[in-house]
C-alpha cells in the first residue's frame, strides 16, 4: 500500500468525529485545527499522474483520504492490513499514533499495487513532483493492525469493523407544515423581483472562480452578448489528452429552495429533485439518462422527535421524486450540525443531477432572436404528465426547433427576465391572465423557431427587438432590470470598480521585419509545467492544432536533486526547440506577495537564461507567455526589453486587479500592432473574444515607459468593447490596465506576453458567448518557421 501526495499534519483531526458538533463563540479559536487545509497544486499533480494509463493500470485498488484519514482510507482497502504509522511522512514533528491514524490532511491517496510494481509506481509519482512511499502491506489475516514506535496501537478484526457499530434508534415526529416560513410572498412587479435577494445575480461571486480552465466548458456561467444570462447547468466536455478531441459532454445541475423546504421539508425536497432534473432537460439532456446525488444539511437533531422529523420528511420526499422519475441517487453527503447557539439552518436538501449529452446538443438559456414564440411546457400536475411535457420539449429540441430554454425556478417572470439579459432581447406577453409570479415545479420555458402544432403547455408571448420586458400591465427596460438585479449583492460581491472613461485606440500597421533563417516543417514548443501551472494541457492542444509539436517539461522541486534535474531537462529541451511557451496557472500559489516569483527565480538560473537568450538571439526562436506566463515574462524583462535583466521601478509590471479580486469571464481584445511573428495571420483592428482568469493582470507602467511602448509598436493587443473601442470600464478592461493594454511585445516581436487565454478554445467551448474565439497566434508562430 503506497501513500501518495501531501504530508500529514494535525489539520483535519476531528473532522469526521466532530462533523456533527454544535459550534459556539469559542469554536474559531479552539477548533481551528479540525479544519482541513486544501492544496490545489498538489491535487492537480495527482490528477496529472492519474491521467497516465500506464500508471493507473498498475493500481489494484485506491482510496482518497477523507473522513477518518489513514484508519479509513487505508483501512478500507483490504480485509487484512499491517499499517506502519512511522512511515507516514509528517508536515512537522510531534504527532502521536492516534493523530497520524485519524488526521484528515488533504491531497492524499492510498493505492494498492503488486509488490513488483511498487518501485515503478513510486518513480512515476516522482516524475510528477509527488511524494509516494510504502506505508502498509495487505495480509491474509482478516485484521487491521497499526504499528507506531514499536508498539501495536490497534488490532481490530474485520468482522468487528464490518458490523458498523451498534444499532441506533431515533424517535421521529413529522410536524405541521409551516406555510408562513420566511414570510414568502409572490413578487408584485418586475422591478421588485429584480431587486430581491431571491433572484439576485451572483455574477460577483461566480467570477471569483475560473470558469474556462481546461478548455472544456461548453457553457460559461454567464452567457449572451452581454454575458448576463446565468447558465442553469454546468456543461463540460469529457477531459481528453492533447492530440485527442471529443464532442461528448456531461451536464450537471442542482435544485434547492430553502423557503419551500422550511415550509414543508417533504414537498421542498421533492421539488428540489424535480428542479435539478428539469434543468438538465432545459439544457437538452434526456431525463431518462439522469442520475442524482443528494447533500443534506440540517439543524442539530439532539433527541427531539420534531427535529428528527425534518430530515425524515425531506428524504422521503426526495425518495418519492426519485421513484417517480426512475432516477437513482448515488452517494451523497450529510451534516446534522447546523445549529449555532440559538440559531438553526433551514432544512436543506440539495439535489444534484447529472446526465451525458453531445456537446452540439446543449441548449443555452439566453433569448437568441426577436419575433420567436415563447412557450411554457407544463404537465397536468402528475409525475406522468410532467414527464410527457419533458418528452414533448425534448422531441422539439431534437427536431432543431428550440433556440433557448429555462427551467422555472422562482417564477415565470424571473425566467423571462434572465433569458432576456444575455442579448438584451425583449419579451411581450400575449395573455394578461397569466400569473407571472407563480412557481411552476418542473416547468420549462422555451424560445421556439416556430409555432408548434401541439405541446403540453401554453404560449406565453414573443421575443421582441425592443429591449423591454412586458408582462401584462407590468413593463420595464432590460438594462434597468439588469442594473437592479446586479446591484442587490454589489456590497458583498462587487462587480464594479474604477472609471468608465475611454482611452486611445493604438494602431501600428507595420509588419515585423524579423525573418526566420532556421526553417522547420513542424516547429517544437517547450511548455514548462511549474508547481501551480494548470494550463499546460490546453496550451499543448493549441500547439498541436496549429501544427506545432509540444513538449511538456514538469519542473520538480521536492528535493534539491529534483530541482537540478529539472533545470537540466528544461535547458536541454529549450536548446532542441524553436519556441518556449509559458502557460497560465498560479505558480507557487502566487506566493509570497505576488505572482510568477517561482518561475522567475527558476528561469534566472544561468544555464536556463543562456538557453533562452540563445534561442531568441541566435536561433530565430520565439517565446510566448500567457497569464501567469505573461507575469513571468514581464518580471524577467523579456517583455518589453527582449532580454532577462534586473527590473526596477522604471519598468512596467503586472499587479492586482483594480477590483481587488480574481476575475473570470470573456473579454474582447483588439489587435493594436502586428509587429511580431506571432501576428502573421492577424491584422490591426481584428477583434477576438477570449477568456481571462487572473487576480493580477493589471498592466501598469511609468508614463514614459508606456509612451515608449506605444511609440515603438510594442502594444500588441488592447481590451475593447463590442464596437472595438478601448476603455477603462471594468466590463471591457477587467483588471484596469493602463491604456487598456492586454498584451505587449519585445522590441523585435519575438517575445509576446498577454493575459487572455486564447488557448482555451474549441468548437464546443463557451457556446453561450458569441464572437470570434480563434485568435491564430499559434498558427502564426508555426507559419513563421516554414
Regions found by a protein language model. Name each.
Residues 1-588, 602-613, 744-745, 773, ...:
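Glycine/proline-enriched, intrinsically flexible loops and inter-domain linkers
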Residues 7-9, 116-117, 140, 381, ...:
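Short acidic/polar capping segments at secondary-structure boundaries
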Residues 12-13, 121, 341, 537, ...:
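Short glycine-/acidic-enriched loop or helix-start segments at secondary-structure transitions
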Residues 33, 303, 592-600, 717-718, ...:
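Short, basic, glycine/proline-bearing loop/turn elements
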Residues 66, 335, 587, 629-631, ...:
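Catalytic metal-binding/acid-base residues of hydrolase active sites
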Residues 68, 288, 411, 631-632, ...:
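General alpha-helical segment detector with a strong preference for membrane-spanning helices
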